[in-house]
């Protein structure tokens, strides 16, 4: 996220240092004047004399005094993303995440904790969003005293960042939104923030360029003439870019065939 005027937000930096290793950790908290929004990220700096391996670098850790929440996640699969799954928090750990190299359609990097009585338009709700498109983990841990710890950030599985002397590592930003006006109040707060203070530049307030992908129209069965026909129709609809999908390389005509880097001459007859 970002601001265009200083009065839109304030940031607190809490600086911690390990005198033994020389590692410096800066915890960055930003509060937006819009209300109900706090962002958190962390910056690791190696001020020591030897290489350090970062194995876990979460963006957010938040402790809550009780476990009286319903956990909401947004899971799915290809072509059926973001189905709402709910369960009550209980002692132990529950989490969702991705180690696919992207945020994926299986588990969105976004969770909600709502009070059991919260509805669409009333009640206390907290939303947690990670602004990151890679491996992630969203986790809630309830201890024996029924207190809850939420952690959000890069998935530590397979994570190993080499930090040489003098180098820094900045985690992606986690955004927390609180609403006492139910799920809709939380959603509207996220919408207002992300529409104006996430993507910046020329395209922020304009319709984005449109592309056309041939995959669903042709799968592996296409010729040059058929592709040109599809592209021509797409142009009539205002499409500005045509993307040629799977099947154009080697002898790949189904999902069981391997591919290569050479275009298939047969496909273009």
PLM regions: where:
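Polysaccharide-binding surfaces and accessory modules of carbohydrate-active proteins
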Residues: 1-143, 157-159
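Terminal connector regions
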Residues: 177-209
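Short Pro-Gly-centered flexible turn/kink motifs
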Residues: 161-180
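Short acidic, Pro/Gly- and aromatic-enriched capping/linker segments at domain boundaries
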Residues: 146-164
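Aromatic-lined carbohydrate-binding/catalytic grooves of carbohydrate-active enzymes
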Residues: 203-269
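Primarily single-stranded nucleic-acid-binding OB-fold modules
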Residues: 141-146, 218
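Flexible loop residues that form catalytic
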Residues: 47, 174, 247
């Amino acid at each position: 996220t970002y601001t265009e005027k200083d009065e839109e937000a304030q940031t607190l930096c809490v600086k911690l240092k390990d005198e033994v290793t020389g590692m410096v950790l800066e915890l960055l908290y930003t509060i937006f004047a819009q209300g109900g929004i706090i962002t958190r990220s962390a910056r690791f700096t190696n001020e020591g004399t030897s290489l350090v391996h970062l194995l876990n670098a979460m963006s957010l850790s938040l402790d809550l005094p009780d476990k009286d929440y319903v956990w909401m996640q947004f899971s799915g699969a290809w072509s059926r993303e973001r189905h709402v799954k709910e369960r009550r928090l209980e002692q132990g750990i529950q989490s969702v995440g991705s180690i696919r190299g992207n945020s994926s359609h299986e588990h969105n990097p976004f969770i909600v904790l709502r009070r059991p009585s919260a509805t669409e338009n009333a009640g206390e709700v907290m939303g947690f969003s990670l602004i990151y498109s890679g491996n992630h983990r969203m986790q809630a841990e309830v201890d024996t005293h029924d207190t809850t710890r939420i952690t959000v950030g890069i998935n530590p599985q397979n994570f190993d960042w080499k930090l040489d002397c003098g180098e820094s590592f900045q985690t992606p930003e986690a955004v927390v939104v609180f609403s006492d006006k139910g799920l809709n109040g939380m959603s509207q707060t996220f919408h207002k923030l992300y529409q104006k203070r996430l993507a910046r530049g020329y395209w922020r307030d304009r319709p984005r360029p449109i592309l056309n992908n041939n995959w669903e129209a042709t799968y592996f069965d296409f010729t040059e003439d058929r592709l040109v026909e599809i592209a021509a129709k797409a142009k009539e609809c205002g499409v500005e870019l045509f993307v040629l999908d799977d099947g154009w390389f080697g002898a790949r005509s189904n999902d069981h065939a391997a591919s290569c880097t050479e275009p298939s001459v047969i496909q273009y007859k």
